[in-house]
Regions:
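Alpha-helix N-cap/helix-start motif
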Residues: 10-13, 64, 71, 119
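Dinucleotide-binding Rossmann-like beta1-alpha1 core, especially the glycine-rich loop
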Residues: 18-96
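Glycine-rich FAD pyrophosphate-binding loop
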Residues: 1-16
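Short beta-to-alpha linker loops that shape the active-site pocket of alpha/beta-hydrolase fold enzymes
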Residues: 6-8, 93, 126
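FAD-binding beta-loop-beta segment adjacent to the flavin cofactor pocket
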Residues: 9, 94-102
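Short, flexible turn/loop "capping" segments at secondary-structure junctions
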Residues: 12-14, 51-53, 102-103
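Helical element adjacent to the flavin cofactor pocket in flavoenzyme catalytic cores
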Residues: 109-136
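Hydrophobic packing within well-folded, soluble alpha/beta domains
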Residues: 1-2, 93, 109, 130
């Protein structure tokens, strides 16, 4: 069920950032995000609706040893779920993004499968798929 004001994407949908992360501190949330990202890759084609979905990758930065430990735990969960999440040293981060200032970083996490999607297009594609299957 989707609740919107007056028509689809007229309410809060168009305000959404459209981030499609894999990173999550919870196994269940990571699993749902992984499922969604996989679905978005083919959704436009599956329902014959144009979609702007981009797999851009994302770097998460750690300024402390504790944050790096969290990244290591999350990366382990991700790898177990079939995701590629790489723990990076400050030097490796600099290789990924030469303009990054790394002097105060403990390291980071690189997720090449993070991305973004147009929230309005996503909503319309999901609605079209539902209508095609008899939804109203």
């Amino acid at each position: 069920m989707l609740l919107e004001k007056n028509e689809l994407t007229a309410g809060s949908t168009w305000h959404a950032a459209g981030n499609v992360p894999n990173f999550a501190g919870s196994w269940a949330v990571m699993n749902m995000q992984r499922y969604g990202a996989k679905m978005y890759r083919t959704l436009g084609e599956d329902v014959d609706y144009p979609m702007n979905y981009h797999v851009t990758g994302a770097i998460r930065l750690a300024h402390s040893k504790e944050r790096m430990q969290e990244f290591e735990r999350v990366a382990g969960m991700g790898r177990y779920q079939g995701l590629q999440m790489d723990i990076c040293t400050p030097a490796e981060l600099k290789e990924l993004n030469p303009f990054m200032e790394t002097h105060d970083l403990a390291g980071g996490l690189w997720d090449p499968l993070d991305g973004d999607i147009d929230p309005a297009q996503l909503t319309q594609a999901l609605a079209k798929g539902a209508r095609d299957e008899g939804g109203r």
